Amino acid sequence: MELLERARQWASHDPDPATASALSADIEAAERGDEEAAARVGAAMNGPLQFGTAGLRGVVGPGESRMNLAVVIRATAGLCEVVTRHATGTPTLVVGCDARYGSSEFAAAACRVASAAGVRVLALPQANPTPLTSFSMLHFDVDAGVMVTASHNPAPDNGYKVYLGGTVAQGDGRGVQIVPPFDAEIAAAIEAAPPADEVPMNDDLIEAVDPREEYVACASALASGEASAREDLRIVLTAMHGVGAAITSRVLSEAGFSNVSLVEAQSEPDPDFPTVPFPNPEEAGALDMAIEQAREQGADLIIAVDPDADRCALAVPDPTSEKGWSPLSGDQTGSLLGEFLASRGMTGSLANSIVSSRLLSRIAQAHGLEHHTTLTGFKWIARAPGLGFGYEEAIGFCPDPAHVRDKDGIATSIVAASLVAALKAQGRSVWDELERLARLHGLHVSSPLTFRVEEIEQIANGMARLRAQPPSVLAGSPVVEVSDLSQGYRGLPPTDGVLVLTEAGDRVIARPSGTEPKLKCYLEVILPVAEGEPLPWDQARERLGAIKGAFAEIIGL
């Protein structure tokens, strides 16, 4: 069917007057020869927005390829059809949303579609953090959950994240994001759903719920150590213009961290994220305002939660840094938290993703704990058998899987603050603890190499070049293993990626991003530390630099 005719049909079934009229206006302009309008129509109708294990995520706008009311309505119709098929008795669904553009409208529509489909709906308060939705999965023992969020994506984006539990998913998958084959089953049901304006909607089975008090109690209970040490810790907290400021401040206060200073300019939800180029605490410059405030106030710790508060970044004083502060990498934080929890008698296993540092496995071994390596994403990490703590290098941490089976930046802030408070009380720093771990287990240094692309085909081309001509030597060390992760790897399900391992133990994993137009390479080198000698940082940086140069040439982006 001709593009403009398909677009015209979509617009005629779009129940949102704003997106329907915007698409219709572009169709009319395109018919008059307006090339820019024609390009916008092409982008809006470039195939249905794909539903996968991450749910939906895309730019907010009109058409089948964007995040909008019509897409959310049809997605919810498909989800409810699948949940009803698998549930025992009346299915239950919890729905939450952040404060991005369209979030509250999308969540309200999801509630009304589910209600009309015979699903009992628990509607969370508007503008809530993702961990509250994750918490609600287990707290209310529901069959499914929807969180409308694009997490730390740029301002124009939104998304639709799906969890399963209750009678639909039990065991290690209860309360966790979807994995295959549920993603394909839901995608097929969405494709079979009627046009959005023909999907029934009502309010009959919607009930407002608010489990914030219960969540605050669980998260604040993760605090440990002397009360005086917690009171003595000076924290600067930023929520990156998201929904996490009030609840994270409350949890820290309930946990005994009374000396918390908010970055006020970033504390109120604002979908434009005006003070940061990207609302991602990992991005360069994202913590500048927090660092400036921390320097002025003589703080001990910066905690940054991302816009939906499921991820947590830390920064600490660093006398070697020009700014006097340095952020910790996800691997540094994950290793510190894993060691901290294990040393305090944590039961259960430690787990991290295949692209995260191998240091956690050595920490687990030292404490007599099981360790599990998983595929990337908490849909896999949270399924690790007997999980006690899990993390991924992209500053996602799960410190309380008994209550939240997903990454949780708010709960993480409590464990991290407890760790830094305990170190301060001993007269030690985070850097001292990282050095201790390096001397015990070897210096593990990880670094990303990221290629952001304009055309998605460039990612596939780069991966194809790597598979066709993998390196034989990296940083002077022979390559001893090249594994295509799409064929499965050491018992893990297949995933798009390539792992390269050298004789020296250097490792690179290349994979496409699941949420952004990026090809990501995850590098890690491990060096032994001689007793009484300085840590071999220069050697590690030299090896990482050589590996980055080689991979940039191979991938060709």
Predicted stretch roles:
Residues 2-110, 205-235, 243, 491:
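An N-terminal, well-structured beta->alpha segment
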Residues 10, 14-18, 40-49, 158-294:
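Gly/Ser/Thr-enriched, mixed-charge loops and adjacent short helices
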Residues 45-65, 150-153, 239-247, 251, ...:
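Conserved phosphate/anionic-ligand binding catalytic regions in large, soluble enzymes, centered on
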Residues 50-66, 89-94, 112-116, 193-207, ...:
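Gly-rich Lys/Arg/Thr-decorated short loops/hinges at beta-loop-alpha junctions or inter-strand turns
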Residues 94-157, 251-314:
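N-terminal small/polar loop signature for handling phosphorylated ligands or for N-terminal nucleophile
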Residues 295, 299-301, 305, 322-326, ...:
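Phosphate-binding and adjacent anionic-ligand microenvironments
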